[in-house]
A protein has these predicted regions:
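Helical "lid/coupling" subdomains associated with nucleotide-phosphate turnover
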Residues: 1-253
Length: 253
């Protein structure tokens, strides 16, 4: 489960050694690119397992687009050293998308300064403080992510997104089943977004139902994740590693 997220060839023994070392020195940071990949792969699996366990304890009736997938949370606020120490926001976002596999439309925010534990403690004394911190810019708005649920064949168009900016310009992009697309939207801008599912894809309102909304700018903008839910990684190592590299490149490396 760990090696499937790697783009390099690493022996199981090397991974075990890294895990033992990390257990002994939890505050250590990756010294090489290989170590960084192993640590991020561990982070994906740890978060996936933790979320799976948490879902079993959620109350009945929490809305989901499909059984055993992440409920429709908005917003998703995440923190932790693996996310905050990632060299790029694109890597942080991809870890979250791979591990959580959200569906529908979600805003993903990163606690890059590890403020959440302190704010959680402070909330007992001042319940408004965490809200003020969220609005202060102390957290990084990573992206608005749209993840359609679709059973279409690989390569089929499943979603068309149109962004109308304040200057009147319009950006249009289509995402295919299995694809990952990005529409840049700088922080500070607010645009009108129209999402039109195709071939009965569902983004939260029902199969084929269009959504119109306003979205604000973020570090990575609008991300259209058509890779499928649940995310099914191909078994061929060479093709899988090439695909993961492509996803990283799409999100900025």
């Amino acid at each position: 489960n760990i090696t499937r997220w790697l783009t390099i060839d690493v022996s199981p023994q090397r991974i075990s050694d890294y895990v033992y070392t990390k257990a002994l020195y939890p505050n250590s940071i990756p010294a090489t690119q290989d170590d960084l990949q192993i640590e991020q792969a561990l982070g994906r699996e740890a978060l996936r397992i933790a979320m799976s366990a948490a879902q079993k304890k959620l109350p009945d009736g929490v809305p989901t687009l499909k059984k055993n997938l992440l409920p429709s949370f908005e917003i998703i606020l995440a923190g932790g050293s693996i996310l905050s120490n990632a060299p790029t926001f694109g890597q942080s976002l991809l870890i979250l998308l791979d591990a959580l596999q959200p569906t529908g439309v979600n805003t993903l925010i990163l606690d890059a300064n590890n403020l959440l534990p302190a704010l959680g403690a402070a909330a007992e004394i001042n319940s408004i403080l965490p809200v003020q911190a969220l609005e202060s810019g102390a957290f990084v708005n990573l992206a608005t992510v749209v993840s359609p649920l679709s059973s279409s064949r690989y390569g089929t168009n499943i979603l068309k997104a149109s962004l109308r900016r304040a200057d009147g310009s319009v950006s249009v992009v289509e995402v295919k089943q299995g694809g990952l697309e990005v529409l840049p939207l700088p922080i500070g801008q607010v645009t009108d977004l129209v999402l039109q599912p195709q071939h009965r894809a569902d983004i939260g309102q029902g199969a084929g139902k269009k959504i119109s909304m306003q979205v604000g700018g973020s570090a990575l903008g609008l991300v259209l994740d058509g890779r499928g839910r649940p995310l099914d990684l191909i078994s061929d190592e060479v093709r899988r590693r090439s695909l993961i590299k492509k996803w990283l490149w799409t999100l900025g490396g």
